[in-house]
Amino acid sequence: MRVSASVKKICRNCKIIRRKGVVRVICTDPRHKQRQG
């Protein structure tokens, strides 16, 4: 899980999702998981 100020899609499987006001990236590749914090 990478925590960064700006989250971007890395590959075409990445999806940007808002959960409880937190922007997240979920992907089939676990290294692409990100959270905006």
Curated annotation (Swiss-Prot):
GO terms for molecular function: structural constituent of ribosome. One of its GO terms (cellular component) is cytoplasm. Pfam families: Ribosomal_L36 (PF00444). One of its GO terms (biological process) is translation. Keywords: Ribonucleoprotein, Ribosomal protein. Transmembrane segments: none annotated. It comes from the Bacteria. PANTHER family: 50S RIBOSOMAL PROTEIN L36, CHLOROPLASTIC (PTHR42888), LARGE RIBOSOMAL SUBUNIT PROTEIN BL36C (PTHR42888:SF1). Belongs to the bacterial ribosomal protein bL36 family. NCBIfam families: rpmJ_bact. HAMAP family: Ribosomal_bL36. This is Large ribosomal subunit protein bL36. It comes from Polaromonas naphthalenivorans (strain CJ2).
